[in-house]
Amino acid sequence: MTAYRIDGARFSTLEEFFDEVTRVMIPDDFWGHNLDAFDDILHGGFGTPDEGFELIWDNADLSRDRLGYPETVRQLELRLKRCHRSWRPFVAAQLDQARAGQGDTVFDWLIEIIEDHGPGGRKSESNVTLTLRPAEE
């Protein structure tokens, strides 16, 4: 099985995470650099193997911190500016939660998307295995 290794020490924002995905997983392809497009990449066939792959996330503990509530607040503020007005109350409520240090973080969003493509996930046919590795001490 093909394995891709991303390094949490190389990024501290969602945009930089997307850059790392490009560098490691699909260096010759253009993609949307958003959560929906990342989900599409995990299906396979978009520069990634149809039969699935392992995603190894080095320094995942660092990513958990860097992609925590401050980055989540920043992302939700951006989303609030761009979203359709019918979604604004929902996004504003998420933003209030994040400002209070509650709810899912950007790190959680990414993990949920990846795990949805693995064993027991709604899109398990993608056969993506996630391995989180802490920083080596």
Give residue ranges: language-model regions:
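Positively charged, polar, low-complexity stretches
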Residues: 1-137
